[in-house]
Every structure is written in structure tokens, then in C-alpha cells.
A protein has these predicted regions:
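Conserved non-catalytic scaffold segment of RNase H-like nuclease domains
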Residues: 1-102
Length: 102
């Protein structure tokens, strides 16, 4: 099983920045069997450059769940799966840091 993950963030440093969106597709080797996607309130302002780049604005995030509110869903969906991402080191560092912040 593979958890194909894509995130958007407030910047490029996992120790200082936060996830603003996560999408997860669980693939069994033949097809996608689960999908999960949500905006995440980073509890900080979205830098204007990042908002222009991603299209994600403070207004979109204000009522989004905080990471601790979706953490259990993320664990349940990805448990037992191999983490796959386009830029895996970047995405994994942010997901790992968000869990460390809990």
C-alpha cells in the first residue's frame, strides 16, 4: 500500500513553517482505494508570496481545522503505507514536524 501525499505550506522550513493543505491518496498497487484532502489552519498569517503561489489565502484557512484536529485521520489513512511524494524529503519533513508539534 502506498500513501501518495501532497502538501502546501506557509514556507520552506519545516521547523518554522506550517502545513496549509494536505491531500492523501492511498493506492493498493492497482488503484486508488482511499482519498483524503483538507485545508489546515496554520495558526499564523499566510505570507503574501506563498498565497500568490498556491492560491491559498488567510480567508480560506480561518475556518479550516487545525493540524491536531486532523492528525488522527492522517494516521488512520496512512498507517501501514509507504510514504510517496513528488518531493518526499520536503513533504515528509513537514508532516513529521507537525506531529512532533502535537
Amino acid at each position: 500500500m502506498y500513501a501518495i501525499i501532497d502538501i502546501e505550506t506557509t514556507g520552506g522550513n519545516a521547523s518554522r513553517e506550517r502545513i496549509t493543505e494536505i491531500a492523501i491518496y492511498v493506492h493498493d498497487g492497482s488503484q486508488v482505494i482511499k482519498e483524503y484532502s483538507t485545508l489546515i489552519n496554520p495558526e499564523c498569517k499566510m505570507p503574501p508570496f506563498v498565497a500568490r503561489l498556491t492560491g491559498i489565502t488567510d480567508e480560506m484557512l480561518v475556518h479550516a481545522p487545525k493540524f491536531f484536529e486532523v492528525a488522527r485521520d492522517i494516521v488512520e489513512i496512512t498507517e501501514g503505507c509507504t510514504f510517496v511524494a513528488h518531493n518526499a524529503a520536503f513533504d515528509y519533513s513537514f508532516v513529521k514536524q507537525e506531529f512532533l508539534n502535537l
